[in-house]
């Protein structure tokens, strides 16, 4: 268990003890290989607001799998599940020439501009629990927990968001649960199937 969250998801749907129902995909899991952390670069917002912004750009829906609130549109630290996650649909959050980070990366966006401010303590706690859960469930090693800027040149997730701190916090959540932390495998080794 990870702080009350079961470490395994079923292949598709169905209740799992201790896991928020919305975290359980309705479709067979994708072969997730990494987690990509973003900031919204806005002082406020939430999944609904970002979905509207993404649709205005011509996208089919919210590009992230999860959004973590900062207390503006949603409760501070609240994890919102985007419509892509239940369907296990590829992301639209980290475009590269070969699209591997969208195809194989779970996109998590924290509300806030972390070039200016720091994420809240509640956001970091929620992020570390979610990342630990996803690492354990999908066998994602710590070095495949990335900032958007690790996938291409961008300031996202901001100068005040430490991805190294997220990795450490998630590793601590796993250690406290008795779950092993998988050794690193070099983020550059994410290959297309």
State each model region's role.
Residues 22-23, 29-58:
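Active-site acidic/histidine clusters and adjacent loop/turn architecture
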Residues 62:
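Aromatic-lined glycan-binding groove of carbohydrate-active enzymes
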Residues 47-49, 78, 91, 121:
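Short, solvent-exposed loop/turn and secondary-structure capping segments
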Residues 87-89:
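Conserved alpha/beta core surface patches that mediate binding of polyanionic ligands
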Residues 1-36, 70-73, 78-85, 96-193:
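Basic/polar, cationic surfaces and motifs that engage anionic cell-wall
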């Amino acid at each position: 268990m990870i702080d009350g969250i079961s470490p395994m998801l079923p292949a598709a749907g169905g209740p799992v003890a201790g896991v928020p129902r919305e975290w359980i995909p309705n479709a067979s899991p994708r072969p997730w290989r990494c987690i990509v952390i973003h900031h919204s670069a806005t002082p406020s917002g939430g999944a609904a607001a970002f979905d509207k912004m993404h649709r205005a750009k011509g996208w089919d829906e919210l590009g992230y799998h999860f959004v973590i609130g900062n207390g503006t549109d949603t409760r501070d630290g609240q994890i919102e599940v985007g419509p892509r996650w239940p369907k296990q649909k590829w992301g639209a959050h980290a475009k590269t020439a070969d699209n591997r980070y969208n195809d194989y990366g779970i996109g998590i966006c924290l509300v806030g501009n972390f070039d200016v401010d720091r994420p809240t303590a509640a956001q970091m706690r929620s992020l570390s629990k979610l990342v630990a859960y996803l690492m354990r469930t999908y066998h994602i090693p710590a070095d495949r927990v990335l900032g958007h800027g690790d996938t291409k040149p961008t300031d996202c997730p901001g100068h005040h968001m430490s991805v190294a701190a997220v990795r450490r916090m998630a590793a601590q959540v796993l250690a406290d649960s008795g779950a092993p932390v998988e050794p690193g495998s070099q983020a550059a080794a994410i290959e297309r199937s």
